[in-house]
Amino acid sequence: MPKKILFTGGGTVGHVTLNLILIPKFIKDGWEVHYIGDKNGIEHTEIEKSGLDVTFHAIATGKLRRYFSWQNLADVFKVALGLLQSLFIVAKLRPQALFSKGGFVSVPPVVAAKLLGKPVFIHESDRSMGLANKIAYKFATTMYTTFEQEDQLSKVKHLGAVTKVFKDANQMPESTQLEAVKEYFSRDLKTLLFIGGSAGAHVFNQFISDHPELKQRYNIINITGDPHLNELSSHLYRVDYVTDLYQPLMAMADLVVTRGGSNTLFELLAMAKLHLIVPLGKEASRGDQLENATYFEKRGYAKQLQEPDLTLHNFDQAMADLFEHQADYEATMLATKEIQSPDFFYDLLRADISSAIKEK
């Protein structure tokens, strides 16, 4: 019988990306791969879009909140149902292990796997743990972290960032679509790429729409998340979503304007790509992006600009400062030791799974 592994994680693209890096490696080595998530969640969309040989198991999901809400009462029942469904799935499949990338949907599968005696491995990308992973940690065999955790947690392994990027632009796949974009861009202007992520693109979209004069100063690439904004015109390329074109666009950009999600930040670090961070504030998140942005700025990897301060004047000042000190930023990023290859993490995870199975 083939070995089986369960993956879980969802809610945002960041809670799926690492899973999509690891899954093909397990499949290549003959593992049977299953995924537990929300059928209406981005995890289901991404798994289907990937075309990977993965069996998806849908469960009920409820949001975990730190504050009082009447919705909590309904969600308690959803989480309980999700736990029962997860127990059934894990008991039926009898996997060798479960790997979780976090998000609210991941808690019931993690608890179920632990209750049924299966090794549980979880990953935390942010400077501080979210509520879902704080709960999941109690049931985990091992937690891998991108950042060093300030608390002394016995089950934590500080890994660094696992990212799959091309540092060399010559390694990028050729794209006729990219060549078409270049036809509308000026070689005399710097190229800026705006990436807002699944939760934060709106502010960038509005900023670019409100300031058409940006096109006179820069070539603009804007990943919008909104197909109604799609446009290719002089010095402007707006597209709702990219997959194969994502890294070529990153390589094409002289500077990236991004939110503070750790996955994107560490991709930029791995590419030594100049970037400005405009993190989501506490009104739109739990404050993790503010922590990530401050960490990157203190390390000398990037500059940050708070969302309320995102005016044309402040933006132009930030651009001028970043380009003036570009060599310093790039040298600091190139010297980093915070990046790990997918192969390194896969080998580590496989070894830890084997050790956990032997210890049972």
Swiss-Prot record:
This is UDP-N-acetylglucosamine--N-acetylmuramyl-(pentapeptide) pyrophosphoryl-undecaprenol N-acetylglucosamine transferase. It comes from Streptococcus pyogenes serotype M1. It catalyses: Mur2Ac(oyl-L-Ala-gamma-D-Glu-L-Lys-D-Ala-D-Ala)-di-trans,octa-cis-undecaprenyl diphosphate + UDP-N-acetyl-alpha-D-glucosamine = beta-D-GlcNAc-(1->4)-Mur2Ac(oyl-L-Ala-gamma-D-Glu-L-Lys-D-Ala-D-Ala)-di-trans,octa-cis-undecaprenyl diphosphate + UDP + H(+). One of its GO terms (cellular component) is plasma membrane. The gene is murG. UDP-N-acetyl-alpha-D-glucosamine binds at residues 198, 289. The keyword Phosphoprotein does not apply. It is found in: Cell membrane. The lineage of its organism: Bacteria, Bacillati, Bacillota, Bacilli, Lactobacillales. Pfam families: Glyco_tran_28_C, Glyco_transf_28. Cell wall formation. Catalyzes the transfer of a GlcNAc subunit on undecaprenyl-pyrophosphoryl-MurNAc-pentapeptide (lipid intermediate I) to form undecaprenyl-pyrophosphoryl-MurNAc-(pentapeptide)GlcNAc (lipid intermediate II). Keywords: Cell cycle, Cell division, Cell membrane, Cell shape, Cell wall biogenesis/degradation, Glycosyltransferase, Membrane, Peptidoglycan synthesis, Transferase. It is a peripheral membrane protein. Belongs to the glycosyltransferase 28 family. MurG subfamily. Pathway: Cell wall biogenesis; peptidoglycan biosynthesis. GO terms for biological process: carbohydrate metabolic process; cell division; cell wall organization; lipid glycosylation; peptidoglycan biosynthetic process; regulation of cell shape. It is an enzyme of class 2 (transferase). It comes from the Bacteria. GO terms for molecular function: undecaprenyldiphospho-muramoylpentapeptide beta-N-acetylglucosaminyltransferase activity. Its EC number is 2.4.1.227.
